[in-house]
Amino acid sequence: NSVAYQVIARKYRPQRFEDVVGQEHVTQTLTNAIEQKRLAHAYIFSGPRGTGKTTIARIFAKCLNATDGPTTKFSDDDPRAKEITDGRSIDVLEIDGASNNGVEQVRELRETVKYMPASSKFKIFIIDEVHMLSTAAFNALLKTLEEPPEHVKFMFATTDPEKVLPTILSRCQRFDLRRIPAALIVKH
């Protein structure tokens, strides 16, 4: 009976908005947007390392693409939410801006954007460390952000929003995450 090894950060990573600690100003605003059906097409989460930017983007993706979504009240065994948690969803693509800073990856993304989601409501692109994209890649991305298809959502995470082109920032709903006080972390 072998127990699979799991990195502690993954094991305890929040899976729902109510599990996220110290970022209620972000999770409540996103919850309200879902409940009021007022969804933007692009979001940017900025803040220091370890504050939950990518985690919140993943949870938000689960809310948007849950079987009965968009909803924050998806069930624990929702197959679409599970796929996203396990990194198996073909409709939620995560890109690491630090290692994929080339124009080719963004051009590839622009080709993919044209196609409807396979089994979900939205095709979601989560780009981590988006500030690491090259200027040429930003410009290629901008074309898609200017006229995004209805079925596409972008979620960007960055520790350095000043390095993101203003033309990109202006097309995103921005959330600034705060450093989480140690006392708050200890309580959880």
What are the functions of these language-model segments?
Residues N1-R174, R178-L184:
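P-loop/Walker A NTP-binding region and its immediately flanking N-terminal helices
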